[in-house]
Structure formats: structure tokens, C-alpha cells
Amino acid sequence: MKYKIPLFVLAAIVLAACSATSIAPTPTLDAVQQTGQAVYNLRCAQCHALAPDTVVIGPSMAGIATRAATRVDGYDAEAYIERSILVPKDYIVAGFVDTMPTNFGKELTSAELTGLVAYLMTLK
């Protein structure tokens, strides 16, 4: 009988770890989005976190696809994100300073830019 209590406790811990409050699964990325994720990890992650409410230097990218759709009248989320990469001085988020390199978008190939925008659009 003395071994059943620890086994019960272990089972309870395992079940608690498998609860419905776990983190949502990462969406499956297509090839274009994977290219963008690689660009993000290499060129963006040093300044932009993926965790909500986490500031490294620039604003967090958590939820950017949703927020970008409401930033500028006449721009959908993709257009806003692309423009903010190509001409970062045009759209500085309130509370942040203009530190994004102005030539950043010019250093990306067309495929890298398309991929980066596609990847950021998965961050809802």
C-alpha cells in the first residue's frame, strides 16, 4: 500500500502536465513561410521578440498579422508589413525610436522579402 500513494501522485503530476492549458501548437509553415522564418531568425530576432509583451529593442512580433491590418488606413496587413520593412521610417510604432536600419529591405532578395512577410502573416 505504501507504494500506491507515490504512484498516484506521479500519475496526477503527469495528467496535470497534459492539461488543456498547454501552449497552442505552432502552425505548419509552407516553403515560402519557412524561408521567411529563417530570415526572421537570422535578421530580425535580435531586435524583435516573438513572445507577447516582450521588448528587446523593437516591438514584439507576436500578433503582428492582426495588428498590422489596423495600423494604416488603406493598407492591409501584408502591405503594411512589407512597407514597414522597406521604408521603416514611415511607420514607427508609438513608444519606440527609429533604430531599424533603413537599408534592411534593400539587403533582402525578393524571395526573402516575400518569405519574411508570409512568415510574419502567420503570427496572429
Per-segment meaning from a language model:
Residues 14-17:
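C-terminal motif of bacterial Sec signal peptides marking the signal peptidase cleavage site
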Residues 33, 37, 49-84, 106:
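Gly/Gly-Pro-rich "capping" loops immediately C-terminal to redox-active cysteine motifs
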Residues 123-124:
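Short, solvent-exposed mixed-charge patches
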